[in-house]
Amino acid sequence: DAAFNGHNHAYERSHAVRGDAVDPTGTIYITVSPSGAAMDGNTGDWFTAATYADWADWGDLDAVAVWVLVTVDGATASARTMSLSDGVVDEFDL
């Protein structure tokens, strides 16, 4: 499973998490919101997957503007996170 949200002004992706532990059968949490307003990066005091090191799989510490392209083919899905300046910055399977 995957859960996408977009309130924090940074890009971050967790490992698959179930309950309070990393678990390959769990949900991947993706925040896709670094564009438009000022970007935060992953340095705040608030709790997010990227600030909890055991859960973080990828975080945008440089606060680059990105979008995510999700490709679904039958029962499989993959995602590529892209930026205008850097091209592909993250790739993962769902």
Question: What residues fall within each predicted segment?
Answer:
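Metal-dependent phosphoesterase/phosphodiesterase active-site architecture
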Residues: 1-2, 8-94
